[in-house]
Amino acid sequence: MDIKQTAVAGSLESSDIMVTVNPSDVQGITVQLESSVEKQFGQQIRKVIEETLKHLGVKAASVEAVDKGALDCTIKARTITAVHRAAQVEVYDWKEIDSWNA
């Protein structure tokens, strides 16, 4: 999936995460994380974001995430939404997304 514009999903409320996806001129994914629980869960948060991007077929993007204690399912949902918005995709492949949980 090609990232065409900057897009945001989520909020800065407690138990949520704000994910911003930006286009990148170079191949690869960069994740910049800000979290009060980064020492305990930073590696897991990055892993969820990176795996979600991989499933979506994103090859080049810069991601900024501001975490406020979000669960993995919330991180995944916010990442999916931000990527679809950034790629200007209006149709979700729910069967494909659901198959990730198998």
UniProtKB/Swiss-Prot annotation:
Main subcellular location of this protein, as a coarse class: cytoplasm
Superkingdom, taxonomy of origin: Bacteria
O-(phosphoribosyl dephospho-coenzyme A)serine modified-residue sites: S14
NCBIfam families noted in UniProt: citD, PRK13253.1
Name the record gives this protein: Citrate lyase acyl carrier protein
Record Pfam families: ACP
Protein's cellular compartments: Cytoplasm
Keyword flag Cytoplasm: yes
A single cellular component GO annotation: cytoplasm
UniProtKB keywords: Cytoplasm, Phosphoprotein
Lineage: Bacteria, Bacillati, Bacillota, Bacilli, Lactobacillales
Oligomeric and partner information: Oligomer with a subunit composition of (alpha,beta,gamma)6.
Aminoacyl-tRNA synthetase recorded as keyword: no
Family listed: Belongs to the CitD family.
Extent of the signal sequence: none
Protein task: Covalent carrier of the coenzyme of citrate lyase.
